[in-house]
Amino acid sequence: MIKTKHHLLIILLILISACGYEPLNKGFPESNIKIFKKTFSGDNQINRKIFNKINLRETKDELGYELKLNSNKIIDQVAKDKSGNVTKYKTTITIVVELIENQKTVKSKSFSKNFNYSNLSNKFELKKYQEDIETNLINSIAREIKIFLN
């Protein structure tokens, strides 16, 4: 009876450990998409960060794709107090991705993320916080673009 319980426990542990769990990002193969031309419009700093994060291979021959990135960043004042001072902001980043082959759009999609946050009394800290928010939004959008292109 005790040996049966031990055998059952061992089999159960083997099955659980071999269930095939792996992180979502681990399963992404390296992208086979080769880019021979990239065109950026809008906020070039955001476009460069996105392009670097999606890890596409660049090639010299025209056998690859053309990638167009159009980005836009908006910082809105969402709320003000009675004296007219801003109390809340919203940062929105929108990126339109186009993958073109032989002057025909193969894939196209718009990605948008936003984040609401309170104003800080120290403007230096506020600027730094806004940069951190921008980086986080860019990372999130880059993950979505990578999934879209694969």
Task: Report residues per predicted region.
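Surface-exposed short loop/turn segments
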Residues: 51-52, 62-108, 112-131, 139, ...
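Sec-exported extracytoplasmic/periplasmic mature domains
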Residues: 55, 59, 142, 146-150
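Post-signal peptide N-terminal segment of mature Sec-exported envelope proteins
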Residues: 29-49
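Bacterial signal peptide processing site
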Residues: 20-22
